[in-house]
A protein has these predicted regions:
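Conserved GNAT acetyl-CoA-binding A-motif
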Residues: 106-118, 247-257
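Conserved donor-binding loop and adjoining core beta-sheet/short helix segment
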Residues: 35-96, 209-221, 226-227
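A short beta-loop-alpha structural element at the N-terminal edge
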Residues: 1-21, 156-168
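Conserved acetyl-CoA-binding loop of GNAT-fold acetyltransferases
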Residues: 129-138, 270-279
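Conserved acetyl-CoA-binding loop-helix of GNAT-fold acetyltransferases
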Residues: 90-103, 130, 225, 231-244, ...
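Short acidic/polar active-site loop segments enriched in Thr and Asp
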Residues: 111, 134, 216, 252, ...
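Conserved beta-strand-loop-alpha-helix junction that forms the acyl-donor binding cleft
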Residues: 115-124, 256-266, 282-287
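Flexible, substrate/cofactor-facing loop regions flanked by secondary structure
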Residues: 36-41, 152-218
Length: 287
C-alpha cells in the first residue's frame, strides 16, 4: 500500500517552497501549465500558489512528492494546475490527489474541470487521459515584445472610467457570452488588477478590451468589437492602441491565449506582431 497521505497547503504552509518546486519546469516537455491565464508560461512563484483556490499535497512521510492546484475559472468550473507527482506510482498518486480535489469541488458546488497540457509534455497528456479527461481544443499562447513601435493611432481610445463600464461590459459580454469577467462588475475586476480599454468611433462605443499586468508582461484577457461595428478594423486599431498604452505604463511584453480554431483572432494577433510561443491541449471532465 502507498505510504502517502494527502494534505493541503492551507494546513501545511511551511511546505510552500517544496510544493512550488514541483511546478518549476518552464514551457517544454516537463511543463505543467498554470491554470491562471496571466501566469501561463511564466516562472512559477509562491504567490501563484497562494492565489489558487486550494493546493492539495501528496506526502510521503513528511516529504511532498505531489501537488495539484485549483485555479479559478468560472462560477461552475475550475482549471487544475498539475497533477505533479515525482515519486512512486505517479498515476496512483495523481488519482489520490484528484479524488481529494473532486470531493472539495463537489462540496463547493462546482460542476466541471479543465486541465491544460503543454503539447510537448507526453507524460502529462497520457496521465490526464488515464484520469478520465477528454481532449477538447488546443489553446495557443502568443507573445510579442512591445519595445519601440511606430506611433499608434490613439484617437478615440481610452482607459475606461467607471462611467464607461456599462459600455465596456456590453461589448465584452456580447463577444464572450460564456465569460464571467463582467460578474459581478468591472470595479471588482479592476480591484483585482485589470485595466479596461474602450474605443469610441463617431461618438459610439465600438470595441473594448481587458488587460491584466503581471510584472513587465501585460496579458490581454479579452478584446471584442461590437457586433454592428465589425469589419471596419476596429479590433486592430484598439489592439495597437492598447499595446502603445501598456508600453507607456512600463510593460515590455504582451501575451495572450487563443483557441486554435479562432482563425480571425489569430490573424489579428499575428498582424499586430504576436508570435506563437507554445501550445496546450484543453482537457475537460466532470467534478
Amino acid at each position: 500500500m502507498p505510504r502517502w497521505t494527502v494534505s493541503d497547503l492551507d494546513q501545511r504552509p511551511e511546505l510552500i517552497t517544496s510544493a512550488l518546486a514541483l511546478f518549476a519546469a518552464g514551457p517544454g516537455h516537463d511543463h505543467l501549465v498554470c491554470g491562471t491565464p496571466a501566469r501561463m508560461g511564466q516562472p512559477a512563484r509562491a504567490d501563484d500558489l497562494r492565489r489558487c483556490l486550494g493546493v492539495a499535497l501528496l506526502l510521503e512521510g513528511i516529504r511532498p512528492v505531489g501537488a495539484l492546484a485549483i485555479c479559478p475559472y468560472s462560477e461552475s468550473q475550475v482549471t487544475l494546475w498539475g497533477p505533479a507527482v515525482i515519486a512512486g506510482d505517479r498515476l496512483a498518486g495523481a488519482r489520490a490527489l484528484l479524488g481529494e480535489v473532486r470531493t472539495a469541488l463537489d462540496a463547493g458546488g462546482y460542476e466541471s474541470i479543465r486541465v491544460l497540457v503543454d503539447t510537448r509534455n507526453r507524460n502529462a497528456r497520457a496521465m490526464v487521459l488515464q484520469l478520465g479527461f477528454t481532449a477538447w481544443k488546443d489553446d495557443l499562447l502568443y507573445e510579442t515584445a512591445l519595445g519601440e513601435r511606430p506611433e499608434a493611432d490613439l484617437e478615440g481610445i481610452r482607459v475606461a472610467s467607471r462611467a464607461d463600464h456599462e459600455a465596456v461590459a456590453a461589448i465584452l459580454e456580447e463577444g464572450f457570452p460564456d465569460s464571467d469577467h463582467c460578474n459581478p462588475n468591472l470595479v471588482q475586476r479592476e480591484d483585482d488588477g485589470y485595466r479596461h480599454y474602450l474605443l469610441v468611433d463617431a461618438g459610439r462605443p465600438v470595441a473594448a478590451a481587458a488587460v491584466q499586468r503581471d510584472g513587465r508582461r501585460a496579458w490581454l484577457k479579452l478584446i471584442s468589437v461590437a457586433g454592428q461595428a465589425r469589419g471596419r478594423h476596429h479590433g486592430r486599431r484598439l489592439l495597437l492602441g492598447v499595446m502603445a498604452s501598456e508600453v507607456r505604463l512600463g510593460a515590455t511584453r504582451m501575451g495572450l491565449d487563443v483557441l486554435a480554431d479562432n482563425r480571425a483572432a489569430i490573424a489579428l494577433y499575428q498582424g499586430c506582431g504576436f508570435v506563437r510561443q507554445w501550445s496546450a491541449t484543453i482537457f475537460t471532465g466532470p467534478v
